[in-house]
Amino acid sequence: MTSVQNHQQQLSGNNKLKKSYLIYAVSLLLGVSACAPKSGVLRAPSNPGQVSTSAAEEAKKAEEKAAEKEAAARDKKDAAQRNISLLLPFQLDHIGAEGVQENDVKRSALALDFYQGFQLGLNELAKKSDSFNLKVVDSKDNAYYNSTIATSEDISNSGIIVGPIYPIEIKAFGNSLPDKEKLIISPLAASPASEFGLNNLVTITPSITSHTNGLAKRVAKDYITGDIIIIYNTSDNDSRQFLNGMLASIKENKENVKIISVSTLSQLNENLSTTGTNLVVSGTTDKTQLNNLISNLSKKNSEEYNSIKLYGHPLWDRFDFSNHTNFYSLRPVITTESNLKSWTSTTRNFRDTYKAKFGIYPSDQSYKGYDVAVYFGSLINKYGVDNLRSNLTKEPYTGLFNTYKFDYNEKWGFTNEAVSYKEYLNGSFQLQ
């Protein structure tokens, strides 16, 4: 296994050169660590001329040996409480003889950013408690290699594992890990946890189902007697996936609601209420369908007897709605995994610290790495590794980028159900 202990290098120069330098430094450290000899305990040679036939002495030696073995096991377990393995796809094995190139930088950027944020999180915790021993492993984005890592001594001696991050890696690693009680933190994959079937998996990124349930909760909260909820179904995959279970989830949050489902704009128009607010829920990301919906609702909303509020898919955050000048009047709301408030002092301090340390500004992955380190490190400090499972669902967290609120399923482990909300204001979706 190629791995590197917790080392950092100061970056300098332009952004590409800075990342190239760090990749080069990490690759050197990985190589050194992989080739470093293992140290052992030196023992004195036995004295063949000294023989004891005393049963009492033999029994005493056996007791001492058992006590030493028990103490060694206890020390190993105690040390593992502070050991964290971080598995990220640096893919340093792809670097050619000519050295680090631009493609190498791009390929490793996600891993580097997460690693650097994670490191700053551990540094923050070290100010108030004992430091953690971080073992960084290049997972190489290779399923077979991940299956071999899972059975390594480094993993066995770790309290928790953060990573791998890609679905194919997670499956290979999780299925090969001998200790099914050891938590695997999936920090970035958005795939539903049900795809992996690992009850020791902790999925950080909210799934699309979590977004569905989150929006349903918001719609139910906004609903008052006299309103009507209209679920607008379209044929695109994103819409079908997002709206699957929406009606049931809304009713689970508020039983006595007036709610209908439609599949055409004419049906939608026929069911618009002129007395209460029309809470229209759409999951489409098809541009034609979305443009037609917005144009239709904007026209209806301009009529003084209609009041419309629109709820949509989280991917709407990536779209440009500037061609719909009255889009804001629909008061659109979407869910988001991000809780990043760039204007807060905490976020600004992290941003400045990151820039001073690495010479570049943090990316979303950097913030996510920081949150994962602070949350799980804090819980280990508070409860110990052995008690993490029993306390994850009891400990919500509001970080720089993410919020955490975990639910547990005995088939696929812990899933983060926390989402935030954005409303369209001044030309973009903004956190509320």
Predicted regions and their residues:
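Extracytosolic ligand-binding ectodomains
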Residues: T2-G31, C35-Q432
